Structures are given as C-alpha cells and as structure tokens.
Amino acid sequence: FVDLTGGFGVDFSFMSCSFMKRIYVERNSGLCEMARHNFQVLGLEAEVVNGEAEEYLKKMDHADVVFLDPARRDEHGCRTYDIKDCTPNVIDLMPLLLEKADTILLKLSPMLDWQKAVRDLGNHVHEVHIVSVDNECKELVLVIRKGSTEQISLTCMNNDQKFRVVPWGGTKCSMGWNKREG
C-alpha cells in the first residue's frame, strides 16, 4: 500500500492496516515527522518518505493499491474545482499510476464534478463513491483499475443509508436504497 499524498496520515493509518508493506509519501518534512511519531504511537509499521509524489512514483516498485488525496488549492491558496488543477496532477500521472499499481484510490473534493472527473480520467474508473454525512457531501472517491470498463458502479452513502447504481448493458441500470446492516 502506498499513499502518495500522506498529509497528516489519517487516511494512511486507517487504510494501510490491511497491507503487509506500507509506504507513506509526503513532500512536507514537518508532516513526515508528525506522521512518523503518530505511526509509532499507533504501533503501525510504515516506511515514511519525504519527497514529491511524482518522483517517488517514477522509482517505486509495483503496489497492489496506491492512494492519492491531491491538494485542492493552487499556488495562491485558492480552491480548485477541476481535477487537472489539483496537486499532484493525477491526469498527467495516470499512465504511470496504472503501470505501477493494480488499484488506484483517488479521494477528491465533493466540489468537483464527479462526471467530468470520470471523463477526464478515461475508462479506467470502475467505481465512484460519494460519501455524505447528514446529507452533506464530504468526499468523492474514485476506484481506478487496470483494464477499461464501460460500466461504472456508483455508490452514494449517507450515514447509515446506501444507494447503489450498477449499470448492466446499454442504458439500463439497477438501483437500490438500502440501510446498512450492523
């Protein structure tokens, strides 16, 4: 598991537990030191790399899963609303990401147009997850895999409710609104 945009390490701490090898990459040295300390306190063995996502990606070995939560602000601190304006630019990195990982998890701003993001990333997007809390959209997560697909699974979650649209063939789709169990 490789997190190319480590940040505070919260997503990394949660998601990496299912993997034997865990690599956290972050360009900010202060965040790396904080994450290293927190991982030690949590008893989470991880390799912490202080560096740019783009450079690490070029030299890294194959990974089962690569996670990215690109920065959503430009060099002036203004919010960005297009995936191509995020840092790192995932659209530019996509060919190398697909070469280096079986699955790419991409966490994006709820302000982004998910349909445009899917179009921009091409037909490797297999799943779209829209996560809400109390009817307020919090995150957009795209699951990208090698091999193209024409049928994207769309899942919307809000507290204990889950709505899923799974297309099959042409224009038909199956829809269901279910309460999550447990």
Show which residues each predicted segment covers:
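Class I S-adenosyl-L-methionine
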Residues: F67, R72-G182
